[in-house]
């Protein structure tokens, strides 16, 4: 047996196995798509209107009703003079009232002329303002956003000039149109700025997606984002300023809007005027009824006086017509009686004329008051409608403010979303930068590995050739060992036992076969690994070359896109700078226009307020004058009523006194007549007894026969008593001269005393009436 020599010098087959190349997993570059930014919503048009109106402060004043005091007349004057004085006073009052009415008409004419002048002045101002508006519009025609604002200002100016001719409602409407136009212009400017901002944001987003993580461009984009944030903050501040302006205007409109108390006061005054009109109508009806009653009483008094005159003429007519003194006294008594009655009739007629004049004056005052009440009711309706319009405008302003608040909240929400999107875009940009840097690192490592593999290929070829040479040497050694073993077997005398030798030979063969199989397997494996390594290296080299070419193309494209984006960024910066400058100029011009419009609006509102206050003060003054005239008319009417009541009482008292005097006079005359009848009867009896009566009759017939033939109708025979009618039928016809003279003288004395008493009572009543009038006039003046 041969010892297993050289077994220690063999190289195991595992040493020649091909080691797989350590390949790192390939990381494909992640390219991010463009991230669209959510654009902020556009602003909605919100029409805001002002109210300028204006709560006019009502200044009420009342003047004391001053009435001319009537000086008490002298008690010695007659009733006719007092009636003429009353008529002259009434004529003076009527003349003063006519002068006052003329003065009022002149004032109304002057007010109309001033209103026409104001209208002409306002029209001239409107034309001037229109010319200024045209000049401003022609000077700033190139600014698109400002054009709408100037158009709104033009509309506001025109509406203001038209509204100065109307009431407070037109002023408020014009103010609201101005606000709507200004808000529209501001919204258009904001929309233009937002559109520019959106364009900048789009360019920024495209820039951020294409520049693939350039730090400098990212910083510039961040600066652009900061500028946009500042612009958004500025726009938000402008919106807040507009909201504060709207709130101030709402407060101003709320202060200028007339309250419901004013309408309630107008309603109360109207109700009071209606009540006074009703009272005046009732007083007029009652006065008409009293006048009719007084006329009926005057007619009855005239009839009664006529009857009394007839009775007096019938009773007091003398039997002897040759008495001139008796007729003169009777005629004077009748004349005085008639004068008294005529004075009473003149007084009643004067009172009736005065009453008719006062009734006419009251009717005119009632008509004027009715006209004033209707005009005031119309003004009240106009004011109520204007108040309703102002309430609706305030509601519209509230809705506009709510819309602005909603728009502001939307803008804030859009700004917040934009900030979130910018933050996410920045995060994605950082991720893109990291991915690009990692891809570059991976590419560098793969290139290094490829270079290392390419560098290891010659060493692997050397190792492979060395392994082949080793295999050949091992085969030669094995063949040499086999040859030596055969020689030894041939040279050895006796081989060992066959079993041991065959066993060892079998083991050697098995080992040889195994080694041969291992060598063949290792050779095949080495060849396969070498082929695989070559293929893999070639594929990786081709792939890496493709990746390198693609990266070079992408790098070139990115450089070109970065250059174009740089140009676009410069253009966008210039456009943004121009837009910011234009926006600043527009804001400045808008603020100037707002200040000018605010000043013009305040001036117009102040002018309208002053004019309305003057009109209100004029109407209040006229109303106070009408009230004073009404109070004077009421006072004069009450005085007339009191005078009528006093005259009524005095006439009743006079009639009662006349009735009593007539009754007493009738009773006294009846008693006197009875006494005269008794005396006559006694005298006739004595004359008959003495025989003197027949002689007197003869003498009397001879003396008065011619006069009796002429004056038959004037002789009235006295009634005969029933006692002596049968005894003396002729003697009772003619009384004695002395008895008739005594009875007539007594009767005349009694009548004179009665007339003097009546005249004294009338003078006392007149003095009492004058004292009452003089005491009532200070009370009315106080």
Swiss-Prot record:
Top-level taxon of the source organism: Eukaryota
Main localization is cytoplasm
Q: Where is this region: Disordered?
A: 62-82, 182-218
Record's keyword terms, sorted: Coiled coil, Cytoplasm, Developmental protein, Differentiation, Nucleus
Regions of biased composition (Basic and acidic residues) lie at: 62-74, 208-218
Does the UniProt entry include the keyword Coiled coil? yes
Which Gene Ontology terms describe the biological processes this protein takes part in?
cell differentiation; protein export from nucleus
Q: Which residues form a coiled coil?
A: 82-314, 344-437, 498-691
Its subcellular locations are:
Cytoplasm; Nucleus
**One CC-aspect GO term:** cytoplasm
Transmembrane region(s): none
* Pfam families named in the record: HCR
InterPro entries in UniProt: HCR
The protein's role, per its UniProt record:
May be a regulator of keratinocyte proliferation or differentiation.
Query: Know the name of this protein?
Result: Coiled-coil alpha-helical rod protein 1
Species of origin: Pan paniscus (Pygmy chimpanzee)
Provide the gene name from the record. CCHCR1
